[in-house]
């Protein structure tokens, strides 16, 4: 067992890193960290971790190696499993450190190129489950998906890319939660699991917000989407279209055109076009808050009620990303990235160009007025 640095200020009882050391040939637990950064992000193909250890007396020198298997637990709940990508030894100002960085189990699907071939009559559920099992992801949870008539695997195409295209054709999402690979819909309209507040009366206070950043961004918002597929004659044919009529009527023209994977002419392509238009709008409002890391675990794919009296925000948000961090200056902080819930976005989409078309309220609102105007 490596020497543990005797520094109670750095001791974090909530976080546990287990490493299966190839060099030492055993299972080791690490409880003390100088710094860490753990990203749980629904929109990345593989989540990432980064730990910094104070290496007093060379205590950790032989413990870590690239490709070592690791598991990360917060408050006794598994939040990530994966492998080490990089081990960095460094010293500065007379102190020695080790930085250990890596990604979760899904990284193997990214790092492996598929063998070029032509796949026929593919069952995506079976295909994805078999690939996950072959690359070390022990569990899958996949909604029923339609058969794919044909898929040509190109040279240099990753296993993850193939899975992503199959999932996208079904207008679904994919994500890894600890050791389970999911394909389905995000829980964007469930009842809030958490409530975050700032500036509210004491009887309304919940989890206090330390910092708040709300962005309204037009990048990636489309006025029109057209999905093309190939006809038997070899010519392109339109399979699905969708428009944001408010943008078009107001002279805001931002068209996106893309091709489909299959040519069965199903309603899937119209749904894909609609998703292009709505996805851009639904993600145009992005909220990032920070809180003190708590015993209560905060995870993505859940909703939260956020009330902030400074920006006049009172809405239900969907949690897309959670980052657990620790450093000497700030201590243990949880950063949470969110977008409005489906219901909140539906309300704003229907009211584009008016006060209700935004996530914030009137600057002059009292708290009672803010409380009465909840979105979502």
Question: What residues fall within each predicted segment?
Answer:
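Acidic, small/polar-enriched beta strand-loop surface segments
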Residues: 2-14, 75, 164, 176-178, ...
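Solvent-exposed, flexible loop/coil residues
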Residues: 32, 37, 42, 91-93, ...
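Beta-strand secondary-structure signal
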Residues: 48-52, 69-71, 99-101, 226, ...
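Charged- and aromatic-enriched interaction segments used to assemble
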Residues: 94-217, 375-376
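Short solvent-exposed strand/turn elements
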Residues: 95-113, 329-350
């Amino acid at each position: 067992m490596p020497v543990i640095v005797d520094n109670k200020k750095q001791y974090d009882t909530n976080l546990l890193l287990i490493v299966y050391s190839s060099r030492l040939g055993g299972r080791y637990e690490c409880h003390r960290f100088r710094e860490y950064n753990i990203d749980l992000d629904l929109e990345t193909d593989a989540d990432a971790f980064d730990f910094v250890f104070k290496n007093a007396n060379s205590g950790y020198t032989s413990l870590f190696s690239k490709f070592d298997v690791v598991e990360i637990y917060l408050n006794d709940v598994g939040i990530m499993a994966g492998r080490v990508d990089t081990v960095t030894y460094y010293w500065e100002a007379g102190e020695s450190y080790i930085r250990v960085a890596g990604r979760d189990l899904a990284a193997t699907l990214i790092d492996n190129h598929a063998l070029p071939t032509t796949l026929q009559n593919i069952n995506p559920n079976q295909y994805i489950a078999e690939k996950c099992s072959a690359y070390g992801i022990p569990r899958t949870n996949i909604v029923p998906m339609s058969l794919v008539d044909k898929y040509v695997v190109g040279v240099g195409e990753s296993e993850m890319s193939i899975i992503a295209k199959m999932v996208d054709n079904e207008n679904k999402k994919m994500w890894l939660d600890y050791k389970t690979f999911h394909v389905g819909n995000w829980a964007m309209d469930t009842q809030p699991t958490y409530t975050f507040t700032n500036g509210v009366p004491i009887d309304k206070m919940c989890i206090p917000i330390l910092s708040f950043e709300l962005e309204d961004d037009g990048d990636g918002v489309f006025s029109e989407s057209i999905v093309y597929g190939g006809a038997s004659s070899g010519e392109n044919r339109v399979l699905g279209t969708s428009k944001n009529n408010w943008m078009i009527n107001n002279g805001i023209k931002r068209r996106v055109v893309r091709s489909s994977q299959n040519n069965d002419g199903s309603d899937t392509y119209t749904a894909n076009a609609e998703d292009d238009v709505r996805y851009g709008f639904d993600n145009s409002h992005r909220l990032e808050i920070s809180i003190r890391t708590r015993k209560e675990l905060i995870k993505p794919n859940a909703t939260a009620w956020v009330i902030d009296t400074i920006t006049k925000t009172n809405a239900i948000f969907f949690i897309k990303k959670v980052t657990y961090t620790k450093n000497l200056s700030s201590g243990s902080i949880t950063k949470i990235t969110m977008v409005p819930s489906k219901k909140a976005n539906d309300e704003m989409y229907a009211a584009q160009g008016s006060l209700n078309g935004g996530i914030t309220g009137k600057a002059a609102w009292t708290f009672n007025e803010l409380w009465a105007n909840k979105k979502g």
